Amino acid sequence: MATNNKQKSATAYLLFVATYGITEAMRDAQALAEYLRQRTPLTSVVSYPQRGPWGNNRYPGNCSGYLLIDLCATYRPTCVLDPMEGGGTSREVCADMGITYTGFDLHSGTDSLRDPLGTAYDLIFWHPPYHDMKVYSDDPRDLSRAGSLVAFMALLRASYWRFFELLVPGGRLALLMGDLRRNGRYEPLTLDVARLDRQHIESIIIKTQHNVSSNRTQYGGTFVPILHETITIFRRPA
């Protein structure tokens, strides 16, 4: 039985190599190939209980690498940009899938709202701060230090249009965002994201959150915890 499983894994790996074209050593090639073989098509609701071996798992808010894998397997990009790559999940996923990748972050010296970022990307993955839910640095250019929600949304809007212009015709921008509560008030940041550019929205995907404090807390009364984020897919016309 163990031999058969190894043969199946090896076959899946070879199929993955033939399909995606591996150019760099992977963290776990056979596991990734097996995931791609078994994955179901992307739908409007996704759940990733495990984040996988990609990126720095100590980086605050680092998302699951399986989300990036599913986006890349669905849209088949040849050139990916992550303008706020944080813990490097997207960089490592693209390396493992043999996809040309460019990534920047303020902590490595690039201000994505002002500095050159290249051009002609067919997929941009963008996971900005959720306003000041987590403050990522002392740098005043950090979006998490924007101050008011109005100022944050103004910077988010300016960033969105800058990134959108870097897409090739037919390219997509996937923006991962979550809502928050502040002093008892619900702030629907995901709704604000949809309002950035309604005419170019192609899909909205609800992503279940795992391993957050709301999962482990028992609430009483009428309080409803936030256990989801959304990925809004914007598509530049072909």
Feature locations, PLM:
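Class I S-adenosyl-L-methionine-dependent methyltransferase catalytic core
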Residues: A2-A238
